Amino acid sequence: MCEVEDLHSCQPTALAKQFGQIDIYLFDQLLRGRITPEMTVLDAGCGNGRNLVHLLRQNCTVFAVDASERAVEETYELARRLAPATPADHFRMERLEELSFEDATFDAVICSAVLHFARGPIHFDRMLAELWRVLAPGGLLFTRLASSIGLENRIMPLSDGRYRLPDGTDRYLVDEARLLKTTTRLGGRLADPLKTTNVHGQRCMTTWSVWKDDA
């Protein structure tokens, strides 16, 4: 990492090597010390592992699941390069609504750009219930998902809570009231106020981070 007085020599490629293409709002959680090397972390819907580069380099105990076999293979290969001691069975092809882990396994659960692929409210709630089940008391659930916040007049309703966005994609969308109600129903506590990024009026992504308080 670059020292403060050496910022001019800190090249973007060096930062990318250390952190990968990490979600900037997840990066914020790292900066604030909410996800640390001694934690056991699950990336639920890991894709190619882009959010795990730094965690693997820091020797976090990392697990990753995805419904795509190729995604799981790519994430495992990433781990083999960055943290070769990570067991192969930490990388599993699973659906979020049917996780194989024991209750309260993880200190932090990351679920970035996944929940909006829900088929409807029942599917959404099942995925979320599993993420919450495997999160330990005192742990952090970090999610980013598409929402209707800021796009209320630009989306076309389809069915079961799914909408067509201005960018032409179909997504399951939540709003502020749904997220706040769900936080209360889970017995959780917002780690931060809801934050929504409007991407040029084409889609909106909301960061929803929740503490699971000790029982």
Task: Give the ranges of each region predicted by the language model.
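Class I (Rossmann-like) S-adenosyl-L-methionine-dependent methyltransferase catalytic domain
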Residues: 1-36, 42, 47-97, 142-215
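Non-membrane alpha-helical structural segments and their capping/turn regions in soluble enzymes
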Residues: 69, 121-125
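A short acidic, Gly/Pro-enriched loop at the edge of an enzyme's catalytic core
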Residues: 97-109
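A short SAM/SAH-binding and catalytic strip from SAM-dependent methyltransferases
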Residues: 108-122
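Flexible, active-site-proximal loop/turn residues at the rims of small-molecule/cofactor binding pockets
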Residues: 115, 127, 147
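A short glycine-rich, Lys/Arg-flanked "PGG" loop and its adjoining helix->strand segment in the class I
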Residues: 125-137
